[in-house]
Amino acid sequence: MILISVQELQKSFGVHEVLRSVTFSLQKGEKMGLVGVNGCGKTTLMRIIAGEMQPDGGTIHRNKDLRVGYLAQLDDIPLTDTVWGALLKVFEPIRVMERRMAEIEKLLESADPETALRLSSEYQRLTESYNAQQGYAYEGEILRVLNGLGLKPEMHQRQVSTLSGGERTRLSLAKLLLQKPDIILMDEPTNHLDLEAIEWLQDYLTDYKGSLLLISHDRYFLDHVCTTMGELLGGKMIKFTGNYTEYMKKRTADFETRMKAYELQQKEIQREQAIIERYRRFNREKSIKAAESREKRLAKVERLEKPVEEQHVRFSFDARRRSGEEALEVRELSKSFEGQPVFQNLSFKLRTGDRVALIGPNGVGKSTLFRILTHQINPDHGSVRFGTNIDIGYYDQHQQNLNPQNTILDEVWNAFPKLEQTRIRSAL
């Protein structure tokens, strides 16, 4: 059963055309990954489907009474709510039944026979509806989702206003999952999730009975969750059956097939044009008519678009000068915030050329360690020693070291004032 059908969708921002002719459908139970280069219109398409943005052209047909849930960057959860209270609101219809059932139980204690019969009948109807909606299980479901997303019991009574941006995003995700819409729209849901929470979410979405439209740069997440893939390329949608790995194999084969068809058509067009040109050079009535006939036939041929191959970014990190064999030594490093230890007695060494991934659940101190290594904060105890001729490059996930008032060119140029502008532009 088709839940959403998109036909010839178009969207531009000024003179920049983002979506040119997007056509696809989403079936019941289908879990579709949406991929494409940055700026190709993935989030724009998702916002249009969610009803947050209007297209310039085309149509979207949704099944009647279709419930669509959209995980955007921000949610409308009141800041004065507690974490637990915000999620209880998802089950407000069930809680209304609970309150009415409790009220009936009290009324039955002093009701006359006629009233008792009426109240008992209402109580039975409520009980049947309550059980059908698994009203007895909703608090356990809230706990399961909160714990799965890394929002531990000690956070459940905290006000939303005290949560970090990442914690609020996880709370919004928890609310969306508990609402159980027919279609879930997710834009980068693994942001702000640690590995354990990502694995939990993978399993949850794999077992989810509804449909899913997902934007993610995490190919392993896409592999685990998705049953189809949709690629936005040149303002259009190309859809593939299978997960991300299968999509990449089919995409390569599809690109080669389309390129071969395009090249064959171009070759045939050039051959026809050469014949037309030769006929015209004869400059005879018969040959001119033959040329005009071929021109008309050629004009009716539907031209194939040249397939566009996705450009890949390639980074090269070259040291500015030769360093010593030992790059970094950390000894007995400890750090606490407001009396709460983040890590204690941390020791390790890095040698020149080592490549180390720093992993762990949220809150264990990964970013804190980086801030100590880059001299943004001081440790409580321990020492950090860098080797000879070591320069540090630091990429902050929140880009707090960028000046929002600068242009992109000026921001880089201010950091490297001696570089030529052409070299900076080439890097950008």
Q: Could you tell me what each predicted segment is?
A:
Residues 1-262, 311, 317-428:
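ABC ATP-binding cassette signature C-motif
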Residues 251-284, 298-306:
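C-terminal boundary and immediately downstream tail of ABC-type ATPase nucleotide-binding domains
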Residues 294-312, 355:
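ABC transporter TMD-NBD coupling linker
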Residues 101, 108, 123, 130, ...:
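Heptad-repeat amphipathic alpha-helical coiled-coil interaction surface used
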